[in-house]
């Protein structure tokens, strides 16, 4: 059992009051998944310069209490959180629609050094949890992307710096015949500016994917809210 912040005990799933308080459905941009006003399908940034993927969605904002829980999950301190994260993603209409309408899922990979340090690949676990909770889930294309190098820490960088930081970050291990014509979903735990998702999408489209959508459990809000 774990204790949810100020809300009581949980056992691999959120209680209804906590889900209502911290994972309330909200209107989001259909591409970058930032919060938008009701009735607005695309934020101003995406209307001006659209991402290279088709559709994007996130279940929650990267904020309290999710930020701390995601850190615990990624570090392997509390791997059981993946079940609850996947549950929120499969119950959120935006993320569920994208996840289920695909030929395959591609997870953002970890570098060997980072995987060795953590001993746990949170994206692989999250995709496994998602598959278990969907009736007819798409297949997971394991190893479709591989990291070419370790990117510098992204947290302190702005969007322009991040885009430069992820240049030649990934390669695909699949041939064009393996990916050609497929409708893919790239899955990550957190989308901060979308730079990492952009890099992954570019590689998959170049390899012949018909389309790429993206899903993250959490989306970092803009600094101004």
Regions found by a protein language model. Give the residues of each.
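Glycine-rich phosphate/pyrophosphate-handling loop used in enzymes and phosphotransfer proteins
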Residues: 1-225
């Amino acid at each position: 059992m774990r204790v949810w912040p100020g809300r009581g005990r949980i056992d691999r799933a959120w209680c209804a009051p906590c889900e209502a308080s911290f994972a309330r459905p909200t209107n989001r941009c259909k591409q970058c998944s930032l919060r938008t006003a009701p009735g607005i399908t695309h934020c101003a940034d995406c209307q001006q310069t659209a991402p290279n993927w088709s559709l994007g969605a996130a279940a929650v904002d990267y904020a309290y209490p999710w930020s701390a829980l995601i850190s615990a999950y990624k570090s392997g301190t509390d791997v059981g959180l993946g079940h609850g994260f996947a549950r929120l993603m499969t119950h959120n209409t935006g993320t569920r629609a994208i996840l289920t309408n695909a030929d395959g899922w591609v997870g953002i990979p970890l570098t060997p050094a980072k995987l060795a340090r953590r001993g746990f690949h949170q994206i692989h676990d999250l995709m496994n949890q998602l598959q278990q909770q969907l009736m007819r889930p798409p297949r997971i294309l394991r190893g479709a992307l591989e990291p070419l190098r370790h990117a510098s820490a992204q947290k302190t960088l702005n969007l322009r710096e991040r885009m430069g930081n992820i240049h030649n970050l990934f390669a695909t291990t699949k041939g064009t015949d393996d990916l050609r014509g497929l409708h893919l979903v790239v899955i990550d735990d957190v989308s901060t500016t979308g730079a990492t998702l952009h890099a992954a999408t570019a590689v998959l489209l170049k390899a012949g994917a018909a389309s790429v959508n993206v899903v993250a459990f959490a989306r970092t809000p803009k600094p101004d809210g």
